[in-house]
Amino acid sequence: MSKNKLLLGSHVGFKAKNYLVGSVLETLEYDGNCFMVFTGPPQNFMRKELDQNLIDEAVKLMKEKNPLLLENIVVHAPYLINLGSPKESTRSLGLNQLIVEINRTNQIHSKLIVLHPGSALDSDRNVAINHIADNLNKAIEATDNDVIICVETMAGKGSEVGINFEEVSKIVSGVKNKKRIGVCLDTCHMHDSGIDISDPDQTLEEFSKYLDLSYIKVIHLNDSKNEIGSRKDRHDNIGYGKVGFDYLVKWAHNEKLANVPKILETPYRDDKPIYKQEIINLNSKEWKE
């Protein structure tokens, strides 16, 4: 079992040969209690058929080593999906891929898929929001499982939609099946979009003006290389960036979020991940390199 008291883990690989087994082994190495994967390349829609034998092996490994992992697998949808595009062909392509991703998420025993909601490009933002909600409804109707689509808060690059709680709530409100929709709060994205996250309780209170806290299904716990409101979306390691270690510790230990998986998506240092040390630091509330 993990010494990690928090429901805390990281993005891990999903590489050829071992796939989910490799993801679990990497998570155990970092002493994580949850993890997130892409089930294929983040930047394209190429996907290999999942090996059920490897999935079964991974499930067995999780049950033996840390049963919490089996309950807290998160999948991230590919970045190319844009359900808010003014182009119908782009929306249709994204919808079809999202359906594929939801079914793959279910196959690897995950119930949470994080989605970047999309960009308006040269169209009206409210029109884009309606497109996103409409296509989320179609994806949910087309998938016969209980996977929850978690709309991620965005940093505000270009014409990204979902850069504040109001926009995220409009998307969620447009989804008919509320059991299949949730939110992923990204600390770097919120900071970069201009949201003050120095006091999690205050931030959550502001969120609750738009949506119930029960909609928060995933936290992406990241520091930021940029000042608040920069709209840059450049993640930094915990304690190295402009958000700051003490504030991110508050997010990691917040009681209201105790049962929400917190995923590190921080950069490598010297070509190596430092997730294990970040998990130690966040648990102990003491920063060490």
UniProtKB/Swiss-Prot annotation:
Its EC number is 3.1.21.2. Zn(2+) 1 binds at H76, H116, E152. Its cofactor is Zn(2+). GO terms for biological process: base-excision repair. The keyword DNA damage applies. Zn(2+) 2 binds at E152, D186, H220, E265. CDD domains: AP2Ec. Keywords: DNA damage, DNA repair, Endonuclease, Hydrolase, Metal-binding, Nuclease, Zinc. It comes from the Bacteria. It catalyses: Endonucleolytic cleavage to 5'-phosphooligonucleotide end-products. The keyword Phosphoprotein does not apply. Binds 3 Zn(2+) ions. InterPro entries: AP_endonuc_2 (IPR001719), AP_endonuc_F2_Zn_BS (IPR018246), Xyl_isomerase-like_sf (IPR036237), Xyl_isomerase-like_TIM-brl (IPR013022). It is an enzyme of class 3 (hydrolase). GO terms for molecular function: deoxyribonuclease IV (phage-T4-induced) activity; DNA binding; DNA-(apurinic or apyrimidinic site) endonuclease activity; phosphoric diester hydrolase activity; zinc ion binding. SMART domains: AP2Ec. Zn(2+) 3 binds at H189, D233, H235. Belongs to the AP endonuclease 2 family. Endonuclease IV plays a role in DNA repair. It cleaves phosphodiester bonds at apurinic or apyrimidinic (AP) sites, generating a 3'-hydroxyl group and a 5'-terminal sugar phosphate. This is Probable endonuclease 4. It comes from Malacoplasma penetrans (strain HF-2) (Mycoplasma penetrans).
